[in-house]
Amino acid sequence: MHIVTNYHLKPLSPHIRHTAFVRKLLFFLVNICVFCNLSAQTLPLSGTILDEKEECIPGVYLIAVNPKTSEVLATTTSSTDGKYVLPTIPLPFILNATHIGYTSLNIPINNKTDMETARILRMQVAIEQLQEVVVTAEPPHIEREIGKFIIRNIAASPFATGSNTYNFLRFMPMIDIKSEGGISILGKNDANIHINGRSVGDNQMAEQMLKGIPANEIARIEIIPVTGSTRSAENRNGIINVVLKKKPDEGLRVFATIEDRQGYYNSPSGIVFMNYAGKRVDLTAGITTSYNQLRQKSNHSYNYLQTGLSTQSDFRERTRTLNAGGYINLNYNISDHHKLGAQISMGGLDYRKNSSSTSTYGRINSDIVDSIYTADVITKSPAPNLTWGANLNYVFKTDNEGSRLNIDLDLKNNSNKRNINNTYRKDYLASSVITDDFSQRPTVGTIVYGGRAEYEHCFNSDNTLQVGLSGYRGTVDNDFFYGLRSGDDYVSDAGRTNRFIYKDYNLAGYINYQRVWSETLETEIGVRAEKYHAKGSQKTTSETVNRNEFDIFPTLSILYMPSDDHELSLDFTSSIMRPYYGQLNPFITYTSPSTYIQNNPNLKSSKGYELMFSYTLFDDYMLTVDYLYDKDLWTDFVLPIADMTRTYTDNYGNGHALDISLFISQSLFKNYWNFSVEAAFGYVSTRGAVSNRKNRLQ
């Protein structure tokens, strides 16, 4: 239907025009007032929830209810730092806050003043008047969330009393604290250690920081054994993230720890950890230093009955390392929607090692010595090796549903220098001759820089989409000096001195979607694409190494909780293990007069596919089964070549690894005794061939 309306206009008198103008002005002012009133009546509400000790309370459930119709207008949950955000809803409404163990709050929000008051909510522990009061603290249990394991309420654990975070991790399932240093998950290599979601430098510094943080200062510990598409595909060792408690406006807290390990030598260490919480500024920082000394001694005797010859081998070694480092992590809350962060970390290492090996040759049951060969190796850092890194990050909360944009810029720099002086001497009859005297001086400089941008969109509390891009570029300059003794100095051997420069870049994009289908089922699916390019230049021989790789890495996580007593999860991920520059340098490196290392510029990257199943029963029993399939594995092969021994790296085949862990935690005799035990089983099988030689290892 098409309707046409015709208007016939006539000139207006001045009085009528004046009256019309006044009406329009009044109409305009009324609209402005109504608009301002509606704007004031629909402001979003955000704030922080604290307990009686001014500590943040995570997991508080908040509901906004219409007081007239009892209609639920909006719901949300407080985050790990106690913050909550409600979307824009009309006034008035009743704000209800509930949490197990706390008295519920019902706050009427009628105007802007009420909204300002609700920006800080304080909840009190629920108290009942009983004839007899028995206070018990429920010990922490492992909780399963999509893609990770979480333990909260650390302070209630008997293992946390008087302990630091490093020692508390010894009682965590799936985690192994190695005696020689390092923390691993399910028998893998050392996991990446994060504090408050970020790296604090290398793992050695992170471990020292954990020794300085009291366990009761932890809000939660996250164990991520299988990383998803949002993480680098080269990270196959998992992540351990320690999240500290946040207490707004608490000011500065300082923790200091001194430790001493007594062996043949003394090995002291010290850690100072600082945490500052203000209205807009959060700062964590740490300083650590350690002096480690190690002494090794071994004796071996070999009798060759067929020839009647005998060999006596004596080995002595002393190692001294001085480590010092620190980091500062600063977060500034510009507003409720904008946060700026920065981090700087720095570490230094001074290294000394003296080793001596003596081989005595003679005959069985004879005191007569035919000859003695002695090898003395002195290794030291000519100057402290420095490592430093910087990070600048920005977070923009795009709405009140939890959507956000994260931007990270990173820079890392490392300098590593060693002087290795080797002296080989032969004692025969009455003569002593130095057969070889040479010096090796490897100098390696590394710089890596790049950034990452990620957008996380929350459609609602049950649907989240993550999309991200990252790009990193690195340069490694390996300058290897090999010199022969000439007087009081060493002169370069042109056939054994070399310089290798390796440049690479990695471009990645990923998408990840998480869905909560019901109270019993959650899923997460993602895919990551990486483009890797590298070029190495051997300056001595003019040889080049080129690598171009493009790979797709799918991931999938399923969490099924049929009841409060049963949790089942299945995680699948794919990863890649790329050879580092030292394995690709085509130049031969001589390590002794009779041994050398020949690298392989054609070494293939190894792709892996991992599947992990987990079952938790009654929060006290947890079974974890992890299976890993690796393709194109590589290893070092030691083979005799003429009168020399060659170490050669090559791909040889595929591998299967199975790790099973059963963890049991029980409180006995009314929580007077706490029983915790973990049993682990590991099986590895590899099969392949190198140079037509079949190899199988189980």
Language model feature labels by segment:
Residues 325-349, 379-538, 561-569, 623-625, ...:
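Face-selective signature of the C-terminal outer-membrane beta-barrel domain
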Residues 233-240, 248-299, 321-324:
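Outer-membrane beta-barrel translocator/receptor signature
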